Design a protein with these regions (language model features):
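Intracellular juxtamembrane helix-capping segments at the cytosolic ends
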Residues: 139-152
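Intracellular cytosolic loops and amphipathic helices of Major Facilitator Superfamily
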Residues: 1-35, 218-227
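Multi-pass alpha-helical transporter architecture, strongest
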Residues: 195-224
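Structural signature of the two symmetry-related core transmembrane helices
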Residues: 100-115
């Protein structure tokens, strides 16, 4: 900048979210430790549930007597439900808060996944149930990202979201491993598919605890924001 004869502006706010210090220490610092643990549980269980749901749905449908083409077509309604969820979830989060909205979605997802695993249904009704299951479970992962963004102040937001996404990916990796292990124990695919409800339940409880705690990103003074 000296060669270009440009003098830097003293004290200018460049808009960068730069957190000083150890990011992990900040995430587990006073006022943030509990919400960080709960958020990590939400992300881990959310992707465990999502991948168990996605991997085993076609097999469950095939064992239910549907042809591979019918199973593939019915599975596609899961993605349509996820797309529809994105369209309205933002407004719902703005109105009720991300944690309350997600807790409700995970709880409803348990009902729809359990119905697919436990009950024989005609194809049309099954397609509708799969649509709502995808809307509640797959679409909620988008809302989980919004939850992470609202729990931390700006100086910690990048670290908070990044670590939560990383923990969630561990759940995505563990899901097929768990499915294979349960299969080796003699569990049938519908039973493995039903196990996804357990992770949805844990995610619902964790998001409900976040809502009950009512923790939000604190308002920082200019001096605190500059640290």
């Amino acid at each position: 900048m000296q060669q270009l004869d440009i003098a830097p502006v003293q004290g200018a706010d460049h808009g960068f979210d730069i957190a000083k210090g150890n990011p992990i220490a900040m995430l587990f610092g006073p006022g943030y430790a509990l919400q960080t643990v709960l958020l990590w549980i939400v992300f881990f269980c959310s992707l465990m549930n999502l991948f168990l749901f996605a991997y085993w749905l076609p097999e469950v449908l095939h064992l239910g007597g549907f042809t591979p083409a019918e199973a593939a077509r019915a599975s596609s309604y899961r993605d349509l439900g996820a797309i529809f969820a994105v369209l309205y979830l933002g407004a719902l989060i703005d109105r009720y808060g991300p944690d309350r909205a997600l807790a409700l979605h995970y709880a409803a997802g348990i009902i729809f996944i359990g119905a697919i695993a436990l009950f024989a249904m005609p194809y049309l009704l099954l397609s509708v149930v799969i649509f709502f299951a995808g809307m509640m479970i797959t679409g909620s992962q988008t809302g989980a990202n919004a939850t992470a963004g609202k729990l931390y102040p700006a100086r910690m937001r990048t670290s908070g979201i990044g670590w939560a996404l990383g923990i969630g990916r561990l759940g995505g990796i563990a899901a097929p491993v768990l499915g294979g292990y349960l299969l080796s124990l003699g569990m049938h695919p519908p039973q493995i598919f039903f196990s996804a409800c357990g992770f949805a339940l844990i995610a619902a409880i964790a998001t409900a605890l976040l809502a009950f705690r009512g923790q939000r990103a604190p308002v920082l003074t200019p001096q605190e924001a500059a640290e």
